[in-house]
From Swiss-Prot:
Fe cation binds at H146, D148, H222. Belongs to the PhyH family. Transmembrane segments: none annotated. One of its GO terms (biological process) is fumonisin biosynthetic process. This is Dioxygenase FUM3. Its cofactor is Fe cation. It comes from Gibberella moniliformis (strain M3125 / FGSC 7600) (Maize ear and stalk rot fungus).
Amino acid sequence: MNKEKVPQNAVPNGRTKLRQVTSATPLDEVFQYWEEDGAIVIKGLLTSAQVEQLNQEMGPILQKVAIGGHASDVRLQNFHGMKTKRAGDLTNNSAVFRDHLLDNDFIHAVSQRCFAYRGKMGPDAYWLGSASTIHVGPGQKPQTLHRDLGSYPIFWMLGPQGPESQINFLVATTDFTEANGATRIIPGSHKWEFNQHGDRDMTIPAEMKAGDCLLISGKVIHGTGGNKTDQERGCLAVTMCANFLAPEEAHPFIVSMGTAKKLPVRSQRCLGFRSQWPQSSPGLWTKDYSELALHLGLDD
């Protein structure tokens, strides 16, 4: 769509700082704040010891990953960040990710409530879209403002009244500051018509301590800030999407069977090692219309 032809008259909701909760906060309160602003900070989702271990586990991977990624499209290169490291394959390489994020009760509670679509899809109607680092290096320019639901065009067509296609848990593995590229949000923009794009002056930084988590709607306008420091800003992005949508990462082709067999059932399901059973569906991701886990021998 040509942005110049559409009057840009949407305004933020006036929030100057995102509200903060913890994993112990009642879900009704979490969802109230999240639905009002499109983003919320969860304090202390990981402990300092877990963050330290996670950074140690990901260190060797980050040393090898290409800065800026491998996309041949210049537009995607700029979007991903020419001075940003995006490394996946976390399930194979990080015990902290496996034990404390992929199998995190709070993340699952939020995802379960979000993707149940008010009970129409059943309790487990989500799986892992992607999990990757977003390590923003010194000198990285601000990312183009965007909505994450762009990966699923049909949801774009449904507009802001449509259900969520995906949500993102951005876990800080270093402190997030305005100077080092804290993710920037336009509060309330998830309620705008999708032909409204906002601008950087409307954004506020989601400043956090390492271990905190920024939960964002797939509809909210956001983008990584520019890093004006000499230190890297560390982040782990954990995306959940509806389980009738293709995930960004091809987890069953990446995660080893040896690793998968050691995981809890809900982690196996989230990674696509088990079938998906949305309410009223005869089953998705099956073998002979039966549970995939039987074919894979996960229940032996």
